[in-house]
From Swiss-Prot:
It is found in: Cytoplasm. Its EC number is 4.3.3.7. Catalyzes the condensation of (S)-aspartate-beta-semialdehyde [(S)-ASA] and pyruvate to 4-hydroxy-tetrahydrodipicolinate (HTPA). It comes from the Bacteria. This is 4-hydroxy-tetrahydrodipicolinate synthase. It is an enzyme of class 4 (lyase). It catalyses: L-aspartate 4-semialdehyde + pyruvate = (2S,4S)-4-hydroxy-2,3,4,5-tetrahydrodipicolinate + H2O + H(+). The lineage of its organism: Bacteria, Bacillati, Bacillota, Bacilli, Bacillales. Belongs to the DapA family. SMART domains: DHDPS. One of its GO terms (biological process) is diaminopimelate biosynthetic process. The active site is at Y133 (proton donor/acceptor), K161 (schiff-base intermediate with substrate).
Length: 293
């Protein structure tokens, strides 16, 4: 488990489309240096749906090596095929992952009973703790608060990344979970309200680009310093808006390139950020950088 910030890492590619492991190591070092306490490999931001199993394993092994115990390694092992998710989770544990982040099965549109059966089967087979991932805008299905409450009774289902974007859902989640179960915010523009409701941190896209500022925001909230937290959240909002002006991870890869990390373009079916949107993103970053100085 972690508190504070876990970065949903972007996956760097070379110009030929192959993994850029040098950039991968540099990105991880930057995250740890800035105080990030968790690293998510192969999630949405990491283009988990378009990297191969071999690439996923290569990224995971290298992340474990570079982090060397300095951050919690979280593997994105979700699938809409329960058996595939089970095997991927077991393999991730063998390679050194300390936790698995498992998204709700997409496209199938499971019932709540199906979601309970799906996650229970994965948890029963998993040697490491699971973080449920609720992101209905991408998957077409939402975890009901009552479902999360039931799943939270499983000893290996220990956390939830709540990315519905609905503050009222967060409130309902907190009303249904048992003591000791951890909720993390999954939306960078809602870190303050989610943590005010009791989330223990954020699984962040923003922290790829501004890890230190994201950590400062989360740490202020953990310390109960709402004034400082509000200041950070407000300053970061223009950048956050532009980081989601096109579908994630298109903008974050453009932002990382601007920061000097050779992450390359996203893989098809995603394409690089439009020139107009990128100009707005870079302008927002420049303005934020000026405010920080």
């Amino acid at each position: 488990m972690f508190t504070g910030v876990a970065t949903a890492l972007a996956t760097p590619f070379q110009e030929n489309g192959q993994l850029n492991l040098e950039a991968w190591a540099a990105l991880i070092e930057d995250q740890i240096k800035e105080g990030v306490t968790g690293l998510v490999i192969g999630g949405t931001t990491g283009e988990g749906m378009t990297i191969t199993d071999d690439e996923f394993e290569t990224l995971l092994v290298r992340a474990v090596e570079v982090a060397n115990g300095r951050a919690v390694i979280i593997a994105g092992t979700g699938s809409n095929n329960t058996a595939v998710s089970i095997e991927k989770t077991k393999r991730a544990a063998e390679l050194g992952a300390e936790m698995a982040m498992v998204v709700t099965p997409y496209y199938n549109k499971s019932t709540q009973a199906g979601l309970i059966a799906h996650f229970t089967a994965i948890a029963d087979a998993s040697p490491i703790p699971l973080m449920l991932y609720n992101v209905p805008s991408r998957t077409g299905v939402a975890l009901a608060p009552e479902t999360v409450g039931e799943l939270a009774e499983h000893p290996r289902i220990t956390a939830l990344k709540e990315a519905s974007g609905d503050i009222s859902v967060m409130a309902q989640m907190m009303a249904h979970i048992p003591e000791g179960f951890t909720v993390y915010c999954g939306n960078d523009d809602q870190i303050l309200p989610y943590m005010a409701w009791g989330a223990q941190g954020v699984v962040s896209v923003l922290s790829n680009v501004y890890p230190g500022a994201t950590v400062a925001l989360a740490e202020a909230l953990l310390a109960g310093d709402l004034q400082t937290a509000r200041t950070w959240q407000i300053r970061l909002l223009p950048v956050i808006d532009e980081l989601f002006a096109e579908v994630n991870p298109i903008p974050v890869k453009a932002a990382l390139q601007a920061r000097g990390f050779e992450v390359g373009a996203p893989r098809l079916p995603l394409v690089p950020m439009s020139a107009t949107a990128e100009a707005k993103l870079l302008s927002a970053m420049e303005q934020f950088n000026e405010v920080r100085q």
